[in-house]
UniProtKB/Swiss-Prot annotation:
Main localisation: mitochondrion
Pfam families in the cross-refs: DAO, FAO_M, GCV_T, GCV_T_C
UniProt GO cellular component terms: mitochondrial matrix; mitochondrion
Protein's UniProt name: Pyruvate dehydrogenase phosphatase regulatory subunit, mitochondrial
Gene for this chain: Pdpr
Quaternary assembly: Heterodimer of a catalytic (PDP1) and a regulatory (PDPR) subunit.
């Protein structure tokens, strides 16, 4: 039957219908597209007339900004937006993407009434199919998250699937998820409706106008150069879709926007003899790698193949996007999957195979936010084939970012500043997107890692650790050890093991954690971001006092844990700062803060020749010596007393370790366990590591990885930025009051907001949850994002979790809210409110009882054994 379908296709290739589908209507029919001279100046210039650009223009104008110009190189909605399959799905793995898609759905639903332009919006619902139990678990996790944010959904049986869509073959299904309010829509018409509404609000729209480059002066946008002249402006928004990468590089100060295009295929058929009902649900068969929707009485079906075809690697195609060449051989696996799922298609005539470009990013999430190097330069691009679903919400969040300084939701996982220039080479992007595109429909189990673009940034110890069994994860392009596999383990089986249940590395991490608590372990943490701030006078101290909420005017050698807050009191960074001398400071931040923190510091530090900010991440290898025997190892290597009397907690000192001088030794471990961080000049890294491992043998030393670190820090209730802390989280909401000095004698960013919050109270509170009735061996594991229930009512979600080998329980961190039963509005959360509740954690639809704590469970840690009693033979050779 496949060959019969292909023969029909061959006959239809000469049909006029092949050339007429989805021709975007003239932009002048719905929005005032000007052919007159461009204005000399504007407040905002937006590049791109697809759904992203028109959404940003629409929302900026709704928020009161009027002096806006939108430029499109071709016709409005005639780029990738024109070829969009028109499926609006709210079933996303990411919480912020769920909210963006839900907002988009509501926005598109009312656009016809607002503008009078038909958008083809039809609420059909969607059904996501599961051929395996693991896929069903994944859908159940999504379902539980959708329900708590007000998106109706349910898990249904194969029989119910057949009732909702009678043409589907359901014999191989184990279940499905039904989302009744998902929709289909004409993406081009949505973009034109948004443009029309924006135009009515004063936005000036010019088509057939190309942006050549952005004008920049002293790190600030000053205007744009187009093929029709210059426009002075304060803000520029790059919504150029697949050309956003090229446009970013064309600036006077090049900007890296890491995205790359791939070919994306879907077919269109002639109508059925007896058409399906117009509201027949859209089908997503991720295990079969296909999607199916009604289209003009027939069907539209495409998918995400395992072997995608990247395009335009060499640079920008100057022509307006057209349908790319058909490739039926490439599409054949998807077509076969389609015929298995819908056998009745054998008799249906195929009209056309559409091949259009779609853009993808290195981590499968869209890119939005302000440039780290140019103020006033914003980006919204790289939608990973979800532009229609996310476009309305993404445009709203970016407009809020521009107007108010911050979006209303935490969008760090989408922020342009999560990437560095190192992730923007053409070769890297070409290889990475070939992995990303199939991942859209691949089963996403916890803790999976990308396989392409690896070993981009490594510690000097990488080869040494790799030879000792290190298994690697990647963060901001940096390789970090997850755990170390003993020689007798099957490495291949361990790496290929993917599960929502107890992982195969459980026992390995347990032995690493035990060693951290009873002997000594070494974790390579070289990926940490490291800055030095120095001055000739007091400028460094004065500037840092303004930028950070804790008091940094401490004696030389002391370390301060502190937040770098925004004006709303939220965490832009959570870091440790050591005072090296009276006028120099050493700042340690999370790995993925390298670009963001650098941009923030450069934005607020005075432009003073006496003040120097230097990124020294690459200069130092960082080793974390954790455990009660760390003091013995370091004492023997340095011939210096390292006991608390001589080297108190949160103290920093440059010392000799082995033969190496200038090692910055800090009495902290980021876990609450005893030990030291060693910041080693990279030329000494191998020597110091070898000496530590050699001397440490008699103390039971071994390597450990970040999985052990996570277990240790979560059981001690240590919140990490990017997971538990973000720009919308304040110190008062996460138990960080002790790291805020409101009366330190100098104003700091966020102080007014914290003073106000201290008076009014907090509306959420970070708590620690210990699962009671959870069977580690048999039950699904928590990871992050699980709904939290208080007294049977939704109260928040988890932010991170780990198994505590000390408590022999799973521990989750998460925020508790107090939602009014009458209005649903948030109310003040008090300590009493937390303590009086009975809690459950929802894991894929099953609720597990949990105890909530606002402080670490210290009673479990009071039985510390004396180091002399440790049976060191337990650790030798492991």
């Amino acid at each position: 039957m496949l060959y019969r379908l292909l023969s029909i296709v061959q006959r239809q290739r000469t049909s006029p219908g092949w050339q007429t589908w989805s021709s975007a209507r003239s932009s002048t029919s719905t929005a005032e597209a000007h052919s007159i001279a461009l204005p000399a100046q504007a407040q905002v210039v937006i590049c791109g007339g697809g759904i992203m650009g028109t959404s940003v223009a629409y929302h900026l104008s709704k928020m009161g900004w009027q002096d806006i110009v939108l430029l499109e190189q071709g016709r409005l909605a005639a780029g990738s937006t024109r070829f969009c399959a028109g499926i609006l799905s709210t079933a996303r793995h990411s919480s912020v993407e769920q909210k963006m898609a839900n907002y988009s759905n509501k926005l598109y639903h009312q656009l016809e009434q607002e503008t009078g332009i038909q958008t083809g919006y039809l609420r059909t619902g969607s059904i996501s199919l599961a051929q395996t139990q693991d896929r069903l678990i994944s859908l159940k996790r999504i379902n539980s998250r959708l329900n708590v944010v007000g998106i109706p959904s349910e898990i249904i049986s194969p029989k119910k699937v057949a009732e909702l869509h009678p043409l589907l073959n359901v014999h191989d299904l184990v279940g499905a998820m039904y989302v009744p309010e998902d929709a289909v829509v004409s993406s081009a018409d949505v973009a034109l409706a948004l443009a029309s509404a924006a135009s009515q609000n004063g936005v000036q729209i010019y088509d057939r106008t190309s942006v050549l480059h952005v004008l920049i002066k002293k790190g600030q946008v000053t205007g744009v150069e187009t093929d029709k002249g210059q426009i002075e402006c304060q803000y520029f928004v790059n919504c150029a879709g697949q050309w956003a990468y090229e446009l970013g590089l064309s600036n006077e100060e090049p900007l890296s926007i890491p995205l790359h295009a791939c070919e994306h295929f879907y077919l269109l058929t002639r109508p059925w003899d007896t058409p399906l009902q117009s509201n027949t649900p859209t089908i997503v068969d991720a295990d079969g790698r296909i999607y199916i929707r009604n289209w003009q009485g027939g069907i539209l079906s495409g998918g995400f193949e395992k072997n995608p075809k990247p395009i335009f690697t060499e640079g920008k195609n100057q022509l307006e996007i057209q349908n790319l060449r058909e490739d039926w051989d490439h599409f054949e696996p998807l077509l076969s999957s389609l015929l298995r799922r819908m056998p009745a298609l054998e008799t249906l005539e195929i009209l056309k195979l559409v091949n259009c470009p779609e853009t993808f990013t290195p981590d499968m999430k869209c890119i939005m936010g302000e440039s780290p190097v140019v103020q006033g330069y914003f980006v919204l691009a790289g939608m990973n084939s979800a532009g229609l679903s996310l476009g309305g919400g993404a445009g709203k969040f970016l407009a809020e970012w521009m107007v108010y300084g911050y979006p209303s939701e935490n969008v760090w996982e989408l922020d342009l500043q999560r990437f560095g220039a190192l992730q923007s080479s053409r070769t890297f992007l070409r290889h990475r997107v070939m992995e990303v595109m199939p991942l859209i429909y691949d089963l996403k189990v916890p803790r999976w890692d990308f396989q392409t673009g690896r070993q981009l940034r490594t510690s000097p110890l990488y080869d040494r650790l790799d030879a000792q069994g290190a298994r690697w994860m990647e963060k901001h392009g940096f390789e970090r050890p997850k755990y170390f596999v003993p020689p007798n383990k099957d490495l291949l089986a361990l790496e290929q093991s993917k599960t929502f249940y107890k992982p195969d590395w459980f026992d390995i991490v347990e032995s690493e954690v035990k060693c951290c608590k009873e002997a000594v372990c070494v974790i390579d943490m070289s990926s940490f971001t490291k800055f030095e701030i120095t001055s000739t006078g007091d400028e460094a101290l004065e500037s840092l006092q303004y930028l950070f909420c804790n008091d940094l005017d401490v004696p030389v050698g002391h370390i301060v844990h502190t937040g770098m807050l925004n004006e709303y009191g939220g965490y832009e960074n959570d870091c440790s700062i050591a005072r090296l001398t009276k006028r120099s400071f050493f700042m340690i931040s999370p790995t993925d803060q390298q670009v963001h923190c650098w941009a923030w510091l450069n934005k607020y530090l005075p432009k003073d020749s006496n003040l120097l900010l230097e990124d020294v991440t690459w200069k130092y290898t960082a080793l974390n010596l954790i455990g009660p025997r760390a003091v013995d190892v370091l004492s023997e290597l340095s011939y210096a007393p390292m006991t608390p009397d001589h080297f108190p907690t949160l103290f920093c000192k440059e010392m000799s370790v082995g033969y190496a001088n200038g090692i910055r030794v800090m009495s902290m471990t980021h876990t609450g366990e005893p030990g030291f961080m060693l910041y080693i000049p990279i030329e000494y890294a191998l020597h110091v590591y070898n000496e530590v491992m050699s001397v440490g043998q008699k103390y039971g030393i071994r390597n450990a990885g970040y999985y052990a670190l996570r277990s240790l820090r979560i059981e001690k209730f240590f919140a990490f930025w990017g997971q538990d802390l973000n720009t919308l989280t304040t110190p008062l909401e996460c138990g960080g009051e002790s790291r805020v000095k409101l009366e330190k004698g100098i104003d700091f960013i966020g102080r007014d907001a914290l003073l106000q919050q201290k008076q009014t109270g907090v509306y959420k509170r970070l708590a620690m949850f210990i699962l009671d009735d959870h069977d580690t061996d048999l039950d699904l594991w928590p990871w992050w994002g699980e709904p939290i229930y208080r007294n049977g009512k939704y109260a928040g979600k988890t932010t991170s979790s780990a198994y505590s080998y000390t408590l022999e329980r799973h521990v989750c961190l998460g925020y508790v809210h107090n939602f009014s039963e009458d209005s649903g509005e948030e109310q003040v959360v008090t300590t009493d409110f937390i303590n009086r509740g009975e809690y459950e954690i929802d894991i894929a639809g099953h609720r597990f009882q949990a105890k909530a704590k606002l402080y670490p469970v210290t009673s479990f840690f009071t039985h510390k054994r004396r180091k002399d009693d440790v049976e060191l033979s337990d650790f030798h050779g492991k």
